[in-house]
């Protein structure tokens, strides 16, 4: 797997059009490479940026480990309305749509190239129209006032420690402001309630984290979640489920 090249200083902020010596910067034309990737039960063709300043250019190895876990626990996510944060190339969402027929929306930084590339990868792998997409920069106001996704997922998004507070702010909003699309539906049966207890709550954030960072940095995110009224549970294989703390729920 190639190593992603990026400029951390340019993340989540606009760059000046003029360099420090007053000369205008030349715009470079974006280049891509298409790769075939093996997923459980299928092969996906994914177009990746040769370089992207927001680090959305490559399909990271952790995605494949997360996919294996999701396939093993497919009954926990089938039938859920899902939002993926930090979709990058869109490969994970495309896989879940094709294998589980999951109702899933992609999301990433407000960058048109990212959205266009996800749409391209959807079409390339037989998903038309393309999956719905939400442009959102962590920490900013979310463009949807009453989100109805009962499952939020992400893979390998804890790379930049300075963005943890913004990510937690977005997560808190999505979990606390969740409004079920099926409020008028028939109540769950006892069997369904039992399955929910041993599976994933609604709403929940399910995250896989495979890239290795310092323990202190990693703990900053999880302790930040706890401080925000969220509970963190390790589900095994470095997959974490984050949900509203019961006392927080009751105060909403």
Can you name each region flagged by the protein language model?
Residues 1-252:
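S-adenosylmethionine-dependent methyltransferases
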